[in-house]
Amino acid sequence: MRSPSAAWLLGGVLLLAASGSCNRTVPGNKSKGRSLIGNVDNSPVVAGRGVTVKPGFSVDEFSTSVLTGKLTTVFLPVVYTIVFVVGLPSNGMALWVFLFRTKKKHPAVIYMANLALADLLSVTWFPLKIAYHIHGNNWIYGESLCKVLIGFFYGNMYCSILFMTCLSVQRYWVIVNPMVHPKKQANIAIGVSLGIWLLILLLTIPLYVVKQTSYIRALNITTCHDVLPEEVLVGDMFNYFLSLAIGVFLFPAFLTASAYVLMIRTLQSSAMDESSGKKRRRAIKLIVTVLAMYLICFTPSNLLLVVHYFLIKTRGQSHVYALYIVALCLSTLNSCIDPFVYYFISQDFRDHAKNALLCRSVRTVKRMQVSLSSKKFSGKSSSYSSSSTSVKGSY
């Protein structure tokens, strides 16, 4: 269990770094907000007749360095581009395999199909996010699209957490109760999946209610979600994200870790022969890998999110936002890792994915299977006839 421990250690290191950074001050800056807090800019602006001046916000030096630095204008778009290029085709193919190539809709298949759909819906909007960061964190697509982007972004993260939790609990349930009827399990999985989508839809409503765009007059840019008024950050957003972190991350993470630990104990305590032992060791390695990926992708971002808003609420300043957006960006790598997890978990998915990459139709695959089975049968029958002939000759 070294990998999960490493995940928690990584979260602890980020937390210590964040705590240390919040004590630094910027010389000559007396602004209260040290994170991306927007204060209403009431400075006089000289404008010609007929020229409309947009109401804007002012930000401090730290926020300015984040909005104009290489971290947000180079690093973030590079990572998001990689996730988009890898995640779009891989999740699209995964969803196609689950929906149209997999005949037996087991609960695991249902959860993985929903997970692929959540990743696909999120990755589809990445070009807008990439363009936003490349153009100096300047959002030109309007308030409505900004809300949709943010809603899908956070919705995908918590959808992934919940569906991966369902997968872990379902896999443990199958090991403990192997005699439960698959059809009954599939119906339960469909109901749970619909419930998760409805829950995420309700949980993301506040993101559509709060105004997400802010015009920064000094930089002449319009940010999307990166700069919000201080009263919104301290009040609404603090309570909202704290509830999400506890209810939709911490509790599911505890369930996921518990299910996988119990699964490993059950597999280790079961008596098996040598061939089954190899499969058991492979299953345990896969379980540890999936659990480590889960914790590494989602723990730092959710931990730093709570720390960021807590520091704003208690101290009125925070330098954690830069670390948080990096952790949040790296958590999106989960969207392009998930299809490879499907590949190693499911033998059916491996076969269908290989056939899809080789452009084989379902009919062609069936013909190949019939041909191989007939060859095996003919080989067995020929060996039987030859052995019977030799027996006759001996008499």
UniProtKB/Swiss-Prot annotation:
Other comments on record: Synthetic PAR agonist peptides (APs) that mimic the first six amino acids of the newly formed N-terminus activate the native, uncleaved receptor nonenzymatically by binding directly to the corresponding second extracellular loop to mediate signaling.
Gene3D superfamilies for the chain: Rhodopsin 7-helix transmembrane proteins
Any one GO CC term of the record: pseudopodium
Residue pairs linked by disulfide bridges in the UniProt entry: C146-C224
Phylogenetic lineage: Eukaryota, Metazoa, Chordata, Craniata, Vertebrata
Main localization, broad class: membrane
Subunit annotation: Interacts with TLR4, COPS5 and TMED2. Interacts with GNAQ, GNA11, GNA12, GNA13 and GNA14.
Residue ranges annotated as propeptide in the record: 26-34
Protein known as: Proteinase-activated receptor 2
Keyword Cell membrane on entry: yes
